[in-house]
A protein has these predicted regions:
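Short coil-to-beta transition motif at edge beta-strands of beta-rich domains
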Residues: 1-15
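Ordered hydrophobic segments in well-structured contexts
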Residues: 10-12, 21-23, 35, 59-60
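Short beta-strand-centered aromatic/proline hotspots
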Residues: 19-29
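Short, solvent-exposed secondary-structure boundary/capping segments
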Residues: 31-39
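Cytosolic, membrane-proximal regulatory domains of ion/volume homeostasis and mechanosensation machinery
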Residues: 43-46, 50-62
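Charge/polar-rich, low-complexity and marginally structured segments
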Residues: 56-131
Length: 131
């Protein structure tokens, strides 16, 4: 992390569990956060309860939306990094971030199902008397 950011600088920053490209609109080097205007979504926020990750059986399963185009959010300074690549168009970046999450979760489901199948087969092999 650099401690010499300037207003107007383009950065990559994290807010809760999402990652964004944005423009610094307010910077206080003595503070703990910078006001960043969202320009693109790099990673969509994770769904569910942050205190119990990967657990669907919680009392409240949070639906987390990405920050909106041009929304200004206070982002922790330790998450800021200089960004020098092309800035994706907001809607296209949101669509891609959402697609990537859906694909990763779908692969995870398929992998888990295959693992369970193999573990059940091994269980029958290890303990045939219990099958």
């Amino acid at each position: 992390m650099s401690d010499t950011y300037q207003v107007g600088e383009i950065v990559q920053a994290e807010y809760k569990t999402g990652k964004y490209v944005g423009k610094i609109v307010e910077w206080n080097p003595n503070g703990s956060k910078a006001a960043v205007q969202v320009l693109a979504v790099l990673n969509h926020p994770m769904q569910g309860n942050l205190h119990h990750p990967m657990n669907p059986d919680v009392s409240y399963f949070h639906q987390r939306r990405a920050l909106a185009n041009q929304e200004i959010a206070l982002m922790p300074l330790e998450t800021l990094q200089a960004y020098s690549g092309p800035i994706p168009e907001y809607e296209a970046s949101l669509k891609e971030a959402l697609r990537a999450d859906i694909e990763a979760l779908t692969k995870s489901i398929r992998f888990s199902e295959k693992c369970l199948s193999e573990l059940h087969a091994l269980q029958k092999e290890y303990f045939p008397e219990q099958a």
